[in-house]
Amino acid sequence: MAISTPMLVTFCVYIFGMILIGFIAWRSTKNFDDYILGGRSLGPFVTALSAGASDMSGWLLMGLPGAIFLSGISESWIAIGLTLGAWINWKLVAGRLRVHTEFNNNALTLPDYFTGRFEDKSRVLRIISALVILLFFTIYCASGIVAGARLFESTFGMSYETALWAGAAATIIYTFIGGFLAVSWTDTVQASLMIFALILTPVMVIVGVGGFSESLEVIKQKSIENVDMLKGLNFVAIISLMGWGLGYFGQPHILARFMAADSHHSIVHARRISMTWMILCLAGAVAVGFFGIAYFNNNPALAGAVNQNSERVFIELAQILFNPWIAGVLLSAILAAVMSTLSCQLLVCSSAITEDLYKAFLRKSASQQELVWVGRVMVLVVALIAIALAANPDNRVLGLVSYAWAGFGAAFGPVVLFSVMWSRMTRNGALAGMIIGAVTVIVWKQYGWLDVYEIIPGFIFGSLGIVIFSLLGKAPTAAMQERFAKADAHYHSAPPSKLQAE
């Protein structure tokens, strides 16, 4: 494919803008707290959109529309499950985690929080959770870099190797320079770009076909199963698809946004903004794939690339329906989705190494400036390892990413949820829940019992492990109980104004 000058220019302007935000954030980064959590200063709007953008990777604009285009509306169950899971996460975890991390030694990372919350003097929780984050997020990063490279490769006709570096460079630069603030501010811009693309594109597709009723009729004529929500699905399959929503409770890059909010009271507004954004984006992505069926059915001569790879449905519609300048902006939304998730994961890996390994075990007396620079160097190191893994897109290691969502959800999800909801939880309960949840996911995926998505049994057994081992062992210390009570009381305290009341 020949390089389109308008698309190249819009991509370059977009990337330059992200790097510029990184430099602006650099001026606001004074210490390690700023670099890792933005000094806990995010307002509700940035908290909301940053959480959304860090969650939704290229899957939102490629994977989901492609699945709907290929199989019809029945593929939207996963979107319903994700929406419910995200809402429950915002409702039960977000505000509480913001408070509890502050009350437990002002924890900057999940491993740091687990150590303080359960008074883990052995630091086993810190080591295990930090290593799990490093392993899976490095592979997650590699997977994101592959997605960005594929976009550059297909859009500009670059070689894969050139596309690999072009796609990763900008994200690495602004994350390296600006840290958490750069990542959160760019996430906000990227989330805005994503929702713009996912609202405008399906509207133009419907107009291109001749209207909503006409589009629906064409889709039904092609196959009535396209509009059947239960097509080929039984109860177990629907539960498995909706079970993806359980993953939200344990995703470190999303939970970090809650920890960075300026107040637990602002979480209420952030939840409303984020859920509105998420519902509109998921509905738009479903609509792109769904109405794309009608468009390409009416224009079979244009359907070659989509028939070969259904995940190109958004890309092809953007290039066909819009002039190259607008198409460039819309396709930048895919890059935005990839970059927003990648930058968050790079920063989580960097913080795990710097806070939970370097500072905790090697340099307890390290200065704030030293920690900031170690954090920056670790962003670079993790990125280079991820690029090395991504150099061969068929690398079998990348297959481990399929474990990551379920693994984090089952290993960390119940631990996070119980830690902010149940004062009787102990260190042994947390350790048992983490190990049982993770092992269940690995074993269940290998054997595929009952065809249930492995996060569901992992979450259930992990939760049971927490309750059983917490009740069997010694009760939490008086200090732990008191700290929990104070944090819980603070969480339930009245907001500063009635405007913030739920």
Label every PLM stretch briefly:
Residues 1-502:
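Membrane-embedded helix-loop-helix hairpins and adjacent transmembrane boundary segments
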